[in-house]
C-alpha cells in the first residue's frame, strides 16, 4: 500500500509543481492519493465550494477568529452557495503548516479529519489557503477545505 501511495505522489508531482508547497492542487492530490489507496473515487475541486472556502477564510481573517463555527454561531456550510445544493458537507481546518504532505498526514492521523477525507459521501471539495494565521501574524499557512456532494436531481417522467 505504501509503495502505491509513493507512486501516486510521484505521478501527481508533474501536475502539481513543488509537491511540498501548500496549494489547493497539491492538497487535493495528496487527499486523492489516500483515497486511491482505499479504492475510493477522487475528489474534484469544485468552483462553488472553492468560492465558499475562500469567503469563509476571508471572514475568519477579517474577524481575526478561527474555528468551525463563527463567533455569531454561523456554521461553515452557510457559506456554500445555494446553487451547489449539497446533500452532504464537511469541513477540515488547519493552521501553522509549511508543507502539504505534513498537513494532509496530520489530518489522516485525526479520526474526524480522516473521516472527511475518506468519506464516500463526498465527491467535491473547495480549498482556500492563507499565508499565516487568521488571528494575526503567524508562521505557516492556514487552510480551509469544504467537502460536499450535490443532491441527486430527480427527473419527472410524467
Regions found by a protein language model. Name each.
Residues 14-16:
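Boundary at the C-terminal end of the N-terminal hydrophobic targeting segment
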Residues 37-51, 64-73, 114-129:
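Surface-exposed patches in mature extracellular/periplasmic domains of secreted proteins
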Residues 51-98, 117:
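Short, surface-exposed glycine/acidic/tryptophan-bearing loops
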Residues 4-12:
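Sec-dependent N-terminal signal peptides
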Residues 19-62:
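A short alpha-helix/helix-coil micro-patch that ends at or immediately precedes a cysteine
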Residues 94-158:
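Disulfide-stabilized extracellular recognition modules
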Amino acid at each position: 500500500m505504501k509503495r502505491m501511495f509513493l507512486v501516486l505522489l510521484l505521478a501527481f508531482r508533474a501536475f502539481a509543481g513543488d509537491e511540498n508547497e501548500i496549494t489547493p492542487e497539491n492538497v487535493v492530490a495528496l487527499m486523492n492519493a489516500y483515497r486511491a489507496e482505499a479504492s475510493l473515487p477522487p475528489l474534484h475541486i469544485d468552483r462553488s465550494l472553492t468560492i465558499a472556502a475562500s469567503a469563509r477564510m476571508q471572514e475568519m481573517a477579517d474577524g481575526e477568529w478561527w474555528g468551525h463555527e463563527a463567533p455569531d454561531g454561523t456554521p461553515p456550510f452557510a457559506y456554500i452557495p445555494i446553487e451547489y445544493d449539497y446533500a452532504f458537507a464537511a469541513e477540515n481546518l488547519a493552521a501553522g503548516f509549511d508543507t502539504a504532505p505534513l498537513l494532509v498526514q496530520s489530518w489522516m492521523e485525526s479520526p474526524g479529519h480522516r473521516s472527511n477525507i475518506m468519506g464516500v459521501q463526498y465527491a467535491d471539495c473547495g480549498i482556500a489557503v492563507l499565508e499565516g494565521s487568521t488571528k494575526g501574524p503567524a508562521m505557516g499557512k492556514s487552510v480551509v477545505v469544504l467537502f460536499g456532494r450535490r443532491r441527486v436531481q430527480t427527473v419527472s417522467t410524467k
